[in-house]
Amino acid sequence: MDYSKTLNLPRTDFPMRANLPQREPEILKFWEENDIYGKVQEANRGKPKFILHDGPPYANGHLHLGHTLNKILKDIIIKYHSMNGYDAPYVPGWDTHGLPIEQQAIKNLGLNRHAVDVVEFRNRCRDYALKYVNIQREEFKRLGVRGDWEHPYLTLEPEYEAIQIGIFGEMAKKGYIYKGLKPVYWCTDCETALAEAEVEYGEERSPSIYVKFPVADARGLFEPRGSSIVIWTTTPWTLPANVAIALHPEFKYVLIQVGEERLLMAAELVRPVLELLGVKDYQVVATFTGSELEGVVCRNPLMDRDSVVILGEHVTLEQGTGCVHTAPGHGLEDYEVGMRYHLPVLSPLDDRGRFTEEGGQFAGLFIDEANKAVVKELEARGALLHFGFIKHQYPHCWRCKHPIIFRATEQWFASIEGFRQEALEAIKKVKWIPSWGEDRIYNMVADRSDWCISRQRTWGVPIPIFYCANCGREIINDATISHLQELFRKHGSNVWFAREAGELVPPGLKCPECGSKEFRKETDIMDVWFDSGSSHAAVLATRPELAWPADLYLEGSDQHRGWFNSSLSTAVATRGRAPYRQVLTHGFLVDEEGRKMSKSLGNGIDPADVIRQRGADVLRLWVASADYRRDVAASENIMRQITEAYRKIRNTCRFLLANLADFDPGKDQVPREEMLELDRWAMNRLQRLIARVTMAYDDYEFHVVYHTIHNFCAVDLSAVYLDIIKDRLYTWPAASKGRRSAQTVLYETINVLVRLLTPILAFTTEEIWRYLPGEDDRPISVQLAGWPQVKTEFLDDELEEKWKRILQVRDVVARALERARQEQDLGNSLNAAVHLYPDADMYQFLKPLGDELATIMIVSRVDLHQPGEEAPAGSLEAPELPGLRVYVTGAPGQKCERCWMVSETVGQDTDHPTLCRRCATVVKEMYMNG
């Protein structure tokens, strides 16, 4: 007889092979055709809101792995909250203005932005941005990210632009907007000013020079003739703009005699400077404090101009001479200290970094050329003491990667000082995750200079300011802003560039200064950080499904100086509080060796390749597996490991489904009080899983979710529970209480796992959902299912502790079995008999388990010996269980053809001579019951 047909073998159509690259697009199509996002929103209407506001990615190029990390994290959070009782809409957005799009339009279309019609150029930029919005939208959707993809927010939309200039107008009305000549970060390659957030630092090799500034008037402190103050600089090209030398008021300065000349520098730096100059013999002539030297006048060795000694707290003794070359047109600290002394602000450069006529003999030279020319001229004039090179961290444009400069130009600024204290107070009321984020942004805001918000480019929102054509008065008021808002809503911001100023001002506008009705308009546009920093007002405050402030902003940690900062500034300036309740940041991407991903290293991972080869769910699991608050590692090897973890989870779910093929939840479920003890333990473990995972989701600790579920599948289920109950599932009568008890656990477990995993493995859980037994009225998608709740009646601390001890015994037995396999050629554990030699306490603990011990250990027989009985030589004792010794022998009897147990009862039933007594009874019952 073929006894395999009498077994309850697992069966399911749920595929063993995931085949995600092919299957995921089908599921994506199902979500779109059935408007799952809309159905989720409808189902959650009226519930408490949870608003995650999407920081807009830049509409330029295809997605990289950083986008993937960010968007999947957001999707995990949204899906969890929507399943757990919240109305959690997700409105994606794009940042669509700015320099990179201009550069691509110029490059791809062969345009000259200075020659082409400005409106035509802006239209080309718009087309380019919208092209990549559409490309990125499809790429984000392919990741399984759920959202209102048909109605995203775009910073180029007319309504958005209208609200943005409204924010600008509100800030101007409060006195926070001003125009001033001030040094700003300037990219000579992009020909525009930059904000702090657009600057990144990298190593640069720069000239290092020590220069003598001859003293013209020592204020009677020492003989000026033959005396010089020594400065050090790494930017020789800025020396033509020098107007002062800054000393620290409290530092000691010495005048030293070196040969025929006298040099003045900080006392602490004399030794390193003279070593560099190769000077061994010198004599200290006089000592002064910085304060005493204030007002001493030197001559700029390059220009026919005085350079006065001033005092500044910014002077340090870390490098140089303690005497700081000061050019207010080329440095913020120089500018600020210069303002106190009413120093002129010189900046003899044009937009491209070329010296103007104001640069005298250096006119026409670019910065690199000027560096060489300045050094050569200093040497010729005998003012150069030392010339060399140093490597140091230097600011670069984060768009074009070229080194940038400080350059004084007329720019528009937002006065951070006007609302700095309010912003600092607002920061304290926000929850920052990780907590160090609070200190980081607090210090940035505390130390931040005023925000340069003007850009000398074309593709952006214009600065909505008019000038009187007669007297030059700047004009911005409620009337001009509201009128422009209406024009922008109707025509978009292109109207500013398409029309003359007279067609843009409200009817009847007069200059409040001179009464003129003739106007011109500002030509600069706004910093794109002002664009995205206005999204809280343009999106959160206007979309009916959203709310202001947001519950959460989630971006990379670089956004403390970027979007978090600009959003905070515009919100505090106009509304008096932060636009977010919580801010969560993730780290950057690195390879396995901790190196930043870059094209030059060739260590990048293209998410499109991973999706093509492994599927989006593998990417999603990778995101969940990482402690993203630190830098996140990615490599081909890591993706392989994640794929293996995915397989483990999938195969566990498949096993659960396969053993529920004949289970009808409506009639076959076994109540708790009738369950076997092992099944009650498994249900207890399941409730603890729900509690632990839910807490981890609440705390945004998705790596804890991943590890907890993975361990539950690998350990609690596969290595313990499922291993033990296989015999019961396969060999017991199909409808027996014991088998149905186990199936009840499997049914509860798969129902919990499919929900707990949905925020992460969105595609796979949708597939599993279709194979769950019973429940014809189940929601169409697992994303519409409720979050699993802890069934407290199954929580049992006593049972937890009891089985913790039983499983310790099981682990020791497993070690003894493994040793026996190696020493006795034991083979399968069912060939074994296990002899337990316990002490009195362990004996009392194990005795009530009786025949269950063999089932738990997955052996054919367990003999529990009396306390005090001596174990044979070679028995195993585990340090963690000193009251127990284990000895393994072969089990007596024959192997049952049906259950594979070795039993002395095999052959006792003559009708079934190859079966053990238990199996023979089951088979006869099956025959009797037809």
From Swiss-Prot:
Motif 'HIGH' region per record, residues: 57-67
Residue ranges of the motif 'KMSKS' region: 596-600
Cofactor(s) essential for the protein: Zn(2+)
EC top class named in words: ligase
Entries under PANTHER family matching the protein: ISOLEUCINE--TRNA LIGASE, MITOCHONDRIAL, SOLEUCYL-TRNA SYNTHETASE
Domain notes: IleRS has two distinct active sites: one for aminoacylation and one for editing. The misactivated valine is translocated from the active site to the editing site, which sterically excludes the correctly activated isoleucine. The single editing site contains two valyl binding pockets, one specific for each substrate (Val-AMP or Val-tRNA(Ile)).
Quaternary context: Monomer.
Protein name: Isoleucine--tRNA ligase
Organism whose genome encodes this protein: Moorella thermoacetica (strain ATCC 39073 / JCM 9320)
Lineage of the organism: Bacteria, Bacillati, Bacillota, Clostridia, Moorellales
Primary gene name: ileS
